[in-house]
Amino acid sequence: MAFKSIAVLSACIIVGSALPVDKYPVLKDQPAEVLFRENNPTVLECIIEGNDQGVKYSWKKDGKSYNWQEHNAALRKDEGSLVFLRPQASDEGHYQCFAETPAGVASSRVISFRKTYLIASPAKTHEKTPIEGRPFQLDCVLPNAYPKPLITWKKRLSGADPNADVTDFDRRITAGPDGNLYFTIVTKEDVSDIYKYVCTAKNAAVDEEVVLVEYEIKGVTKDNSGYKGEPVPQYVSKDMMAKAGDVTMIYCMYGSNPMGYPNYFKNGKDVNGNPEDRITRHNRTSGKRLLFKTTLPEDEGVYTCEVDNGVGKPQKHSLKLTVVSAPKYEQKPEKVIVVKQGQDVTIPCKVTGLPAPNVVWSHNAKPLSGGRATVTDSGLVIKGVKNGDKGYYGCRATNEHGDKYFETLVQVN
């Protein structure tokens, strides 16, 4: 897939100059998402950088005018920041701040305001007696949570301080992305009267890790099934989608005795890599996952892992990796541009994404339509600038994987 690019607004200014923002009233950048814990005070910032004299602030929630006085909220003194004193689930939504200044009406990006939570049933302890020499797994059901929690497996000494937990396992043992703990084979070394295998979860909703389940391996039994140690699939990644710029992992976990070390190929080419490479199977999992330290668009393709431990038939698994990208600025736009009347100006804002983003523009917080502004491959061009062209120009780019918003103040002298 080609990495498409949209030249939304040119990265060069035709006429005019960029000046320090501290001389002009511009909004401070806001995050795309703000999380809150129920009943914990939380702030949605809206602050003018530069001259904030005579600024009037207002908010919208889900596209409608928002009267903070009718809710359990307040505005910070001398700024437009919205303070939720005891936020509730009903406060969730998409918020946007507006600042009316002598230069025009500035608008923030749309901010997603979401409750963070982690709901888990009381942890239970289960006793297990697996079959010696056979592949095995310990299940950990993922909790109902937002955002997605970090799942961690540990060996915990009964009655000991959790800070003393052991997190480094034998190379036979690897946690899968589904939350489960996989044993390539079980041995008597996995049996313990004093240690438990503990699965925990943590996200922004909690200060400490939450225990989801505990296991005690009390012993092992003999294998009478005739299993000879040939590779059997435990967890293998299916067709998957990855975001450009993210860390990505392709899993190829097979139980076997002796343990087999997967080899990875992309479109038939070896991609095992070395430990220092961007793509490598050398990441403390004995090759059971292929690590992309930073995912790039050109990583898209068909990947195959092959496992052969010398016993039975070699195993092979293939999947398609599709790479997508939220909108991203190729060059950061200018916050302030000063131009003289009668001159031409191009406002910079160049965006890329997979798929190509949809772009909309605004002028003083209203949709930009018609008028004398012209969209070209090099940007938003205004020829023969007039005093009425001054104000805040917003560039918003969206696709199904995210959005970007930047606003430029055009000052006409």
Curated annotation (Swiss-Prot):
Tissue spec. comment: Hemolymph.
Spans traversing the lipid bilayer: none
One BP annotation, GO: innate immune response
Superkingdom, taxonomy of origin: Eukaryota
Keywords noted in UniProt: Disulfide bond, Glycoprotein, Immunity, Immunoglobulin domain, Innate immunity, Repeat, Secreted, Signal
Keyword hit for DNA damage: no
Residue ranges annotated for the Ig-like C2-type domain, each copy included: 25-112, 122-211, 233-322, 327-413
Entry-listed glycosylation sites: 283
Induction remarks: By bacterial infection, wounding, or bacterial cell wall components injection.
Disulphide-bonded residues: 46-97, 140-199, 252-305, 349-395
Signal peptide (residue range): 1-19
GO cellular component annotations of the record: axon; extracellular region; neuronal cell body; plasma membrane
GO MF terms held by the record: axon guidance receptor activity
Pfam families in UniProt: I-set (PF07679), Ig_3 (PF13927)
Main localization of the protein described in the UniProt heading: secreted
Keyword Protein transport in annotation: no
SMART domains: IG, IGc2
Location within or outside the cell: Secreted, Extracellular space
Family named by the database record: Belongs to the hemolin family.
Primary role: Insect-immune protein. Forms a protein complex at the bacterial surface. Can inhibit hemocyte aggregation.
This protein's name: Hemolin
